[in-house]
Amino acid sequence: MLTRSILSVAVCGLLLSPLLPITRASQEEDTGKQDKQFTVELDPETFDTAIAGGNVFVKFFAPWCGHCKRIQPLWEQLAEIMNVDNPKVIIAKVDCTKHQGLCATHQVTGYPTLRLFKLGEEESVKFKGTRDLPAITDFINKELSAPAEADLGEVKREQVENLNIGKVVDLTEDTFAKHVSTGNHFVKFFAPWCSHCQRLAPTWEDLAKELIKEPTVTISKIDCTQFRSICQDFEVKGYPTLLWIEDGKKIEKYSGARDLSTLKTYVEKMVGVPLEKTAGEAGDEKVVIEEVAGEEDAAKKLTPQQLTGEDEFDQAIAEGVAFIKFYAPWCGHCQKLQPTWEQLATETHQAQSSVKIAKVDCTAPENKQVCIDQQVEGYPTLFLYKNGQRQNEYEGSRSLPELQAYLKKFLGHDEL
C-alpha cells in the first residue's frame, strides 16, 4: 500500500463513484431521516481499489463521535452533489470501529479525520478548514485544479507541453474529441468569412504565445464551416464562440472583452496560475474596436450576469427582481443546468423584462463571503431577490418553462 500523509479535518465531504457499491448507512446514520445514502462506505477490501482509481476524499469516523454525527448531513449533501458520471473526486467514509487496522495504517488518531487522496500521489492532504460547504468545496477545487497533479503522469504533461509551442492548435473532426478529452482547453469556434473572427485571429495567436510555458491549458480553434457536427454538439449559434472545456465537457461560454489582457486574466482565473504580462501590453490592452465592444455589450445582456464580490452582488439585488444561481464549476448538476440558465437569460432579455438573471461562482475567493452570508448549502442553489430582499429558495423543476413560471409570480403581467 502506498504511504500517504494524513489530512485530519473536522469537516465532511465525499464524491459518489458510479464504480463503487453504495452500502447501507452505518450506525452513524442513526436518525433514520435519510433512506438513501450517497456516501461510499469503504472497507479494507475496497479502499485500495478506490484510491488507485481516482481522487477520493475520505472521512474516518466513529459512530459514537458527536462531531462525526454533526458533520454527517453535510458529508451526505456533498456526496449527493458530486453524484455524477465520471466525478473528479469520490466522497467516502471509513468506520474505524469496524476497520481498526485500516485506520491505524492511515494514522487516524481522532474523529472525524478528513483526508484527500489524490490520484497518483503518495501523500494525502489534510483538510484544516471550517466545517461548512463553501470551505470544503473551495478546498476540493484548489487541490484538484492545481497543476501539482502532474506526477501522476509526466508523460501526459509532456504531451500537453508539446502542443503549447506558441501556436493555436487547429482542430478537425478527427482530432477534436481526443484533444479535449483530458485537461483544460480554450477553444474558438469560428467561420472564415466572419469579420469579428478575423479581427480576433491575431489576438488568439498572441494568447497562444503567452501560454507557451503554461502546460495546463491549450488554445485551440475549429472551423465550423468545415466541421459542423462538432459545432452543433457544442450548441454554437454565433461566431466567434469561445468555450472553456475541461475533460471533454463544456464548462463555460466566455462572454468578456476580446483583448489580450482580458483573455489572459480569464485563463488565469480558470487555471489558477498567474500569467506573465508582455511588454507594452498595458498600453494595448484597453484598445478595443467600438463595433466589437458594442457587440459584446449586447451579448452580455443575452447571458447570465457573472457577479463578483460583495459590492457587485449587493448592487445587482438592490432594485427590482434578480434571479441568481449559486454554483461551483465542478458541480455536475450545475453543468447540466448551465444551458437552461443561459436560455432563461436570453429569453428574459428578448421579452424586454426588467428581471436580472445572474450567477455567482462560490469557489471564487472573492465570492466566499457572499455565499456564506446567503447561506448557500448546496449547488446549484437558486435564490430570487426582490428589491434587496431574498424570497424563498427555488426548489422546483429546473426546466425552462418551470423557471419562467416561477419568475412570473414576482413580475408584472406584461413581463415574460
UniProtKB/Swiss-Prot annotation:
**Domain annotation Thioredoxin: ranges:** 26-145, 150-272, 293-412
Q: Which InterPro entries match?
A: PDI, PDI_thioredoxin-like_dom, Thioredoxin-like_sf, Thioredoxin_CS, Thioredoxin_domain
Gene Ontology CC terms = cell surface; endomembrane system; endoplasmic reticulum
Read off the SUPFAM superfamilies from this record: Thioredoxin-like
The keyword 4Fe-4S belongs to this UniProt entry's keyword annotation? no
Keywords assigned by UniProt? Disulfide bond, Endoplasmic reticulum, Phagocytosis, Redox-active center, Repeat, Signal
Give the protein's biological function: Possesses thioredoxin activity. Acts as a ligand for Drpr and is required for the phagocytosis of apoptotic cells. Binds to the extracellular region of Drpr and augments Drpr tyrosine phosphorylation.
Name of the protein in its database record = Thioredoxin domain-containing protein 5 homolog
Q: Which organism is it from?
A: Drosophila melanogaster (Fruit fly)
